Amino acid sequence: MKTRHLIIGASAGAISAIEAIRSIDERSSITAVSEEEPAGYSRPMLPELLAGKVDVKGIMFRDEAFWRRNRVRLIYGRAFELDVEERTVKVSAGRSTLEIEYEKLLIATGGKPITPRIEGLENAGEYAFTTLRDAERLSDGLQGVGNVAVIGGGLIGVGLSEALTKLGKRVVLIELKPHILPQILDERASGMLEEEIKRAGVEIKTGRTVARVHRGGGPSREAVIR
């Protein structure tokens, strides 16, 4: 399979690239590879989905017709091998392996969460929260749960904490840095946001980390903070 433009990923960066290409080039072939289905949803809106404020359609950047309208060959699969000399990418798509030959390549897969090394975490029923699948898995796992600890006070952690309070959960947000959103806000702005989040019902612990997790009474787990 050959294509002029190959894009690995199919979210915000990929969509912007497709629109930019089509604004100056209506004819060249474009192929996008998405590991997730549906393709092209907004990760920052996952907390809104979890809280029940929107459905899956409400978090999509573009509708399904976008790909057809821009004549993009959309492949659902996982890119697992890149040969920069031969300009090829191998993609696992279902039971098939595709080799795609490209002229130009854009990798727009976004980030992956870094799971901290915490004693006992592997048996603690932990959840990541960066994909639609994560949100669906967490939603199922919240059934019958009253208390939730969120590790990380970045955009994902803050948004998730607020969504969880809307679901009636008691939430503790734990951030290693002296204030939340440390890469975005200064201490003063962060303090103002912290007060707003606390009023929403989130307990915030900054300058702290989770040392270990162990089983409490019944099915619950206890996080030891230091």
Predicted regions and their residues:
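FAD-binding core/adjacent interface of flavoenzyme oxidoreductases
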Residues: 1-6, 63-149, 222-226
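Beta1-alpha1 glycine-rich phosphate/pyrophosphate-binding loop at the start
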Residues: 1-73, 163-188
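Glycine-rich Rossmann-fold phosphate-binding loop(s) that bind the pyrophosphate
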Residues: 9-12, 130-131, 151-156
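A general structural signal for well-ordered alpha-helical segments in protein cores
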Residues: 14, 43, 115, 135, ...
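A Rossmann-like FAD-binding core segment of flavoenzymes
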Residues: 27, 74-93, 100, 167-226
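Active-site/binding-pocket entry motifs
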Residues: 39, 112-115, 216
